[in-house]
A protein has these predicted regions:
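Beta-strand-loop-alpha "switch" segments that mediate conformational coupling across diverse proteins
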Residues: 145
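N-terminal glycine-rich flavin-associated loop
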Residues: 12, 35-67, 85, 89-135, ...
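Internal maturation/activation junctions in enzymes
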Residues: 137-139
Length: 162
């Protein structure tokens, strides 16, 4: 998609509460991740809610534009980059939504895609619980990115990937 098609994103700007960017600098900044690849997107969207994400998907479907979810952009497989719409969850959708302790060594949590692994580590500090996937990008890896790529780390051989 070229710069001449930027005006189609005006329609999307009227449907989402989050931020939408088509400028060259921001597109360049989102053209790479932790891999060796560089692919410049047509648009970057920072959604503020799941309703925003629904509208982005509807828009992308209507115009047959690919979507690429992005967390911290620390992955090594190129999953966070692409020529279509990059949906960056780190700016607004980055909260823990709930936590339930099951026992001293078990619990569950619900979070938005931009919630960082390091924030969960800090939350669990002092307890006997931990999240064993332990990606190499450590504290700034996001759960959306980790789940989207089935990330793993040093403990994955014993406990499995995300």
């Amino acid at each position: 998609m070229s710069n001449s098609n930027e005006n189609i994103f005006d329609e999307l700007k009227n449907k989402v509460t989050g931020d939408i960017y088509t400028d060259k600098i921001r597109r360049y900044m989102h053209s790479t991740d932790g891999s060796i690849f560089r692919v410049e997107p047509a648009c970057i969207v920072y959604p503020k809610s799941t309703d925003d994400v629904v509208e982005i998907v509807k828009f992308a479907n209507k115009y047959q534009i690919s979507i690429h979810s992005r967390g911290a952009g620390s992955g090594l497989c190129g999953a966070a980059i692409g020529r279509g719409i990059v949906i960056d969850f780190c700016k607004y959708m980055n909260n823990m939504l709930g936590y339930e302790k099951i026992s001293d060594i078990e619990g569950t949590f619900t979070c938005e895609p931009g919630y960082k692994y390091g924030e969960l580590e800090a939350f669990l500090k002092g307890s006997s619980m931990w999240f064993p996937a332990a990606p190499s990008s450590g504290e700034y890896a996001t759960f959306g990115g980790m789940y989207g790529t089935n990330a793993g780390g040093g403990y994955s051989v014993k406990y499995g990937n995300v």
